[in-house]
């Protein structure tokens, strides 16, 4: 099911509009280039609609949010929905302030996302009957997602994997989006299927913005094959994890987390479908 996904990205060179945060913007641009896509990082409200209209994917990341950027995200998202361009949401630190909570509620109420990545603060509790309407109340009760790396995937273990698969599957059904959570065990789900992915290395937690890079990478993969979003997201998550593993193998005694970050991007650049097939640990739940 994952044949030629990486080849497709290199052949189609999707243009990805990233409205992301300044901490990781350079790495996000570079990882899109490394995988075979092309990034554009425009965020002014006077041009975002036009920029989105010429792109094949839109990546929205709320890591460094403000009113102007939020307005641009809403406008770009509306254009993408109108034109059938897949939209990725990375709600970084969504539960860390009332402002972010309301911003995510606004985005989810007005933009149809193809993929939602990193959902701790949006859906930390089961029993939400309407995600968009219920975001605020849910987040008010669970403000533990304070950092970039927080996520419910921290709680996914072999003992509860079936339960978590059911939970994430229900979130996909409620939002209409493919849901991706990353941690010790990664999970990706659409309305009918759930996959667990067991790639990655613990040193990735020392790279600020690794999750932001994954969202940008995911946007490129999905844009290259938007008819198979679930498969594209699974591949992106696995590729990022494999790249973390391969990067760690390159580490010399004098190397630190900055070298490791660069090695991850190098691994994405050199990734092939054969490498994904050989090293990807993707299983259906």
Regions found by a protein language model. Give the residues of each.
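Conserved N-terminal subdomain of the carbohydrate kinase-like
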Residues: 2-89
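Short, small-residue-enriched loops and turns at beta-alpha junctions
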Residues: 65-68, 93-97, 187, 204
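Glycine/small-residue-rich loop that forms an oxyanion/phosphate-binding "nest" at active or ligand-binding sites
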Residues: 69-118
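Conserved phosphate/ATP/ADP-binding segment of small-molecule kinases
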Residues: 100-194
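Short, small-residue alpha-helix embedded
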Residues: 125, 206-238
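Short, well-structured alpha-helical segments that form the helix of a local strand-helix-strand
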Residues: 168-172, 229-244, 264-265
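Short pre-catalytic strand/loop immediately N-terminal to key active-site residues, enriched for Gly-Thr
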Residues: 197-208
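Charged C-terminal helix
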Residues: 242-285
């Amino acid at each position: 099911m994952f044949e030629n996904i990486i080849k497709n990205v290199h052949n189609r060179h999707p243009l990805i509009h990233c409205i992301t945060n300044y901490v990781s913007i350079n790495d996000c641009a570079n990882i899109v280039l490394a995988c075979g896509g092309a990034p554009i990082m425009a965020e002014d409200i006077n041009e975002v609609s036009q920029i989105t209209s010429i792109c094949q994917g839109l990546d929205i990341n709320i890591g460094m949010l403000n009113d102007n950027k939020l307005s641009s995200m809403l406008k770009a998202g509306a254009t993408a929905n109108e034109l059938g361009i897949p939209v990725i949401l990375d709600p970084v630190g969504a539960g860390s302030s009332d402002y972010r909570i309301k911003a995510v509620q606004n985005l989810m109420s007005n933009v149809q996302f193809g993929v939602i990545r990193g959902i701790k603060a949006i859906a930390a509790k089961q029993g939400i009957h309407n995600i968009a309407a219920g975001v605020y109340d849910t987040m008010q009760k669970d403000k533990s997602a304070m950092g970039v790396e927080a996520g419910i995937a921290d709680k996914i273990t072999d003992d509860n994997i079936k339960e978590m698969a059911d939970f994430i599957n229900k979130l996909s059904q409620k939002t209409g989006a493919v849901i991706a959570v990353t941690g010790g065990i990664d999970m990706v789900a659409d309305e009918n299927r759930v996959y667990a992915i067991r790639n990655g290395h613990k040193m990735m937690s020392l790279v600020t913005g690794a999750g932001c890079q994954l969202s940008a990478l995911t946007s490129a993969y999905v844009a290259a094959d938007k008819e198979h979003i679930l498969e594209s997201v699974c591949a992106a998550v696995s590729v990022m994890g494999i790249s973390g593993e391969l990067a760690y193998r390159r580490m010399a005694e004098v190397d630190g987390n900055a070298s490791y970050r660069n090695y991850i991007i190098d691994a994405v650049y050199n990734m092939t479908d054969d490498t994904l097939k050989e090293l990807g640990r993707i299983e259906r739940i």
